[in-house]
Regions:
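Short, conserved beta-strand edge motifs with alternating hydrophobic and charged residues
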Residues: 136, 188-190, 213-217
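Catalytic metal-binding/acid-base residues of hydrolase active sites
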Residues: 113, 193, 219-220
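Conserved thiamine diphosphate
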Residues: 9-12, 101, 150-208
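Electropositive phosphate-/nucleotide-binding environments in soluble metabolic enzymes
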Residues: 15, 27-31, 74, 78, ...
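Cofactor-binding active-site loop characterized by glycine-rich and histidine/acidic residues
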Residues: 3-134, 147, 152-155, 165, ...
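Short gly/pro/ser/thr-enriched loop/turn and capping motifs at secondary-structure boundaries
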Residues: 54-55, 139-144, 221-223
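Structural signal for hydrophobic packing residues in well-ordered secondary-structure cores
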Residues: 38-45, 85-91, 170, 180-183, ...
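Glycine/aspartate-rich loop-and-adjacent alpha/beta segment that forms the canonical ThDP
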Residues: 198-304
């Protein structure tokens, strides 16, 4: 990561721009990340918000956003961003908007849209080299409708649609790699529990032209089944166990920005969440736990 104005925690914004009193769940990891990201982006943003948890932020006639906000269907937020960006570019070209009035075009979606329903429109937007920032809060399920399985659901997790003794039999898609395969301007994974790493990446992305993704793991007390006050700790465990690598893609290169000095066992992360309780009770499922650990170890063996 290039030199950043955020060198220590003292450099982080002291106050949040995003308003309070929203209808979000207590301890929402997505809202935690959004607060931090919005502080860096500033008020001159237009949020194109796909259907999902975060649409509860702007319940008419109230909104916590200080800039523009547009609601779209789950699959069409990048198309909405194209319209917003095109409209502003036309106004700029005709002199009806000054460069000082120009605004950042930001798509805001959950993993249901980012990994699944909206992936085709996202791919098209990247191929058109649309100048937009895509922000995904990844709570690893369709959280707004009861935590059904999504393309981001991890192996063996219990969801509303996979309640068996082994949980979800499939595997989480690698959205970071899918975006990187398009050769966009920038891709970064972040988490609200690591605010300095997050701030540096968002600040960098803000000053890059083209399609950019900020992919934020969003620990979800409601869907993952843990207490709201544990959100930050769960987030740190995701990083320390190696389950959620913090990295960035730029100019064809991938760089890890925070490598755990000594990774903790993955089960230390899993056992704190009710969605994985079936791996430990009433009988420990050593084979599934080892399978999950082996996949994490295999990932890091390529970089260590």
């Amino acid at each position: 990561m290039s030199q950043s104005r955020f060198k220590t925690f003292k450099d982080l914004p002291k106050e949040h721009l995003l308003g309070t009193g929203t209808a979000m769940c207590a301890g929402c990891g997505g809202l935690e990340a959004l607060h931090e990201i919005y502080d860096i982006l500033g008020e001159k943003t237009v949020i194109i918000n796909a259907a999902g948890c975060m649409t509860l932020l702007s319940v008419y006639p109230y909104t916590p956003f200080r800039g523009g906000w547009l609601y779209t269907s789950m699959a069409s937020a990048p198309a909405g961003a194209q319209g917003v960006r095109d409209a502003m570019d036309i106004l700029l070209a005709k002199g009806r908007m000054s460069t000082a009035e120009d605004m950042e075009t930001v798509v805001l979606t959950g993993d249901g849209a980012a990994y699944g329903m909206g992936l085709s429109s996202t791919s098209g937007a990247i191929e058109r080299n649309l100048h937009f920032l895509y922000l995904c809060y990844d709570n690893e399920g369709y959280g707004n409708t009861g935590q059904q399985t999504s393309g981001a659901t991890p192996h063996a997790a219990r969801t509303a649609t996979n309640r068996g003794v082994v949980g979800y039999p499939g595997f989480k898609k690698d959205l970071f790699a899918i975006w990187a395969a398009h050769e966009p301007a920038y891709v970064a994974s972040v988490i609200g529990a690591e605010p300095l790493d997050l701030a540096r990446k968002v600040d960098l992305a803000k000053n890059i032209h083209g399609p950019r993704l900020i992919l934020a793991l969003a620990p979800c007390p409601t869907g993952w089944d843990f207490e709201p006050e544990e959100t930050v700790e769960i987030g740190k465990l995701a990083v320390q166990s190696g389950v959620w690598p913090l990295k960035e893609y730029r100019n064809g290169q991938i760089k890890h920005t925070k490598i755990p000095k000594k990774r903790i066992p993955v089960e230390d992360y899993l056992k704190r969440q009710g969605r994985f309780v079936h791996l430990f009770e009433p009988k420990r499922n050593d084979s599934l736990l080892q399978e999950i650990q082996t996949r994490v170890d295999a990932y890091w063996s390529r970089f260590e």
